């Protein structure tokens, strides 16, 4: 059993283990912490002890943050709620769940773990079968590339995470950098130097205010303690990580029974509308699809999105349609899907869909009319309330805000205050499984108690959970052992997330069998991307294949299908 020591090794507010606990045992410890803190989560020891965490003792993700353990635990919690639903459906009385912690370690790299007919790595998105949804990022412009990085401000020891989002030129214009400079700046290093020169003219609060005023994304790099002392940090701290509640004015709706189907997976027959972009929401939808839900993902072909998601398991098991909510005909089509849906998963800025008639209140009204509850879950960067709740945000921004980037910088020995990205899209992918867990709790409770449910999951809340004083951080000597085993590269504040995670995969491939283990993958021979598509499979495994998570159809591009209603079940 590990004990804690508040020695602030990685900055203010950090708590470090006094001794190392093997990863499977650490997962068991954290599972019980999360179970005790989560309202409505089972305290049944048969279910908690039924989780079999197994795999390597040493984590495979670089750095002191226990990302791999927390991600494995969130998958285990999904598995537990899935079993509770299976019990309600009368499918099984089994309590056993298998979580391979090595597989959970690969999970944050899902979008990069794609093999199309032998093509892997960054070459995948260059294939003609993969549609391009963000041509600016594919433009090879160094300025666009460096618009997303961490820069030092005029305040000594205070850094800022700039983020180009899906329109880097808006962010660059804020700094007085226009497209006219694009032809002059021909290297990534030159671009970083120019942007650093401009950012250093501002104090941290000044550039934060500019970004907020323009509706753009970015954050000061806070230490964990500094973030907790902000008003937004305090707002998030008031909510549990798995954050959902029954809506009181819908409580009279009767419990919603599950359909009796040949498909024995927990969510078979559950209808999900996925209104998301980029990674976290897509990961949530994919998890629900693997558990049997019918997921219809709605994109607009007029909006940019994350190209690498398409051939990965982020898009497996779904139908993807193209709707423009400014078009009255498409607006009507989405309303028809809302009328049928059991679950609304939305990952746009808070209030954005409500202004178009597709917010929580509209969904609750439709549920009341049909006499069957709905589960509506928002996924965003900053959480359900507080002065930043409606701001746009990305994984890197949440990492900077909550203190994850600060901790990584300290683990590398950089000066106090300098931020460095975590190695993978960890908060994105893990918030995805957190979102799926939140939805599943609502589905379970709708079946038990009736009513409708509203939930919320956020990137920053996930990061705060990994930096919690009870979860703790790894000691420096453990971090060094991880680095020595895989010979990970070091990186600095200028790194871009895509080449960073490919470098992590390269280290895994050279120094271990981790990414070569076929049991972590599934193959599709009927994919539009190629004749043999290999992607990362679901992490949760049950004792019997008939109700274990799986995808019945391969990943597809965005907007791939014609408009369709949910199947009648």
Curated annotation (Swiss-Prot):
Domain of life: Eukaryota
Assigned keywords, A-Z: Acyltransferase, Transferase
Induction / repression: Expression is induced in response to 2-benzoxasolinone (BOA) exposure.
InterPro entries given in the database record: CoA-trans_III_biosynth/detox, CoA-Trfase_fam_III, CoA-Trfase_III_dom_1_sf
Knocked-out gene: effects: Does not affect tolerance to 2-benzoxazolinone (BOA).
Record has ATP-binding as a keyword: no
Transmembrane feature ranges: none
Enzyme Commission (EC) number: 2.8.3.-
Family: Belongs to the CoA-transferase III family.
Extra information: Fusarium verticillioides possesses 2 unlinked loci, FDB1 and FDB2, necessary for detoxification of antimicrobial compounds produced by maize, including 2-benzoxazolinone (BOA). The FDB2 cluster arose as a duplication of the FDB1 cluster with rearrangement and expansion by incorporating additional genes.
Cited function: Acyl-CoA transferase; part of the Fusarium detoxification of benzoxazolinone cluster 2 (FDB2) involved in the degradation of benzoxazolinones produced by the host plant. Maize, wheat, and rye produce the 2 benzoxazinone phytoanticipins 2,4-dihy-droxy-7-methoxy-1,4-benzoxazin-3-one (DIMBOA) and 2,4-dihydroxy-1,4-benzoxazin-3-one (DIBOA) that, due to their inherent instability once released, spontaneously degrade to the more stable corresponding benzoxazolinones, 6-methoxy-2-benzoxazolinone (MBOA) and 2-benzoxazolinone (BOA), respectively.
Protein name per the record: Acyl-CoA transferase FVEG_12629
Species of origin: Gibberella moniliformis (strain M3125 / FGSC 7600) (Maize ear and stalk rot fungus)
